[in-house]
Amino acid sequence: MSAEVIPMEPKKRIGNQEPTRSVILPYEYSLGKEAIEIYEKSKRKAFDWQKFLIDAILALNGEGLWTHMAFGFSVPRQNGKNEVTAIRELYGLNKGERILHTAHRTTTSAAAFNRLLAILEESGLEEGEDFHKIK
């Protein structure tokens, strides 16, 4: 007698995928979609809540200036918070911005640096040819 194979249903996300509280100022448009497209070239996939945050972080007003000069978020018990920062940093690097990532511990900033290098390499870019690292 053979065992019957029962296909499993894909797991559905449990809980609200949007913040329970947020203060996002009105804006004209966002560069978030472009940032996500750059990020997803690395074969990584952004979650909906990450896209929501990136849209707000990269929001511009009618004059083309950043809507939010500072942006903070608290997402307790959720994986992927550091990836939001990586998405923003990756976007900035692609636009010629200089990125300074600080942290309380050297190991934390080194981990962020290595994560960003991995994303660049997973995107098909080569160190020395497409980008230069300064450590």
Describe the function of each predicted region.
Residues 2-135:
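Phosphate/NTP-binding elements of NTP-utilizing enzymes
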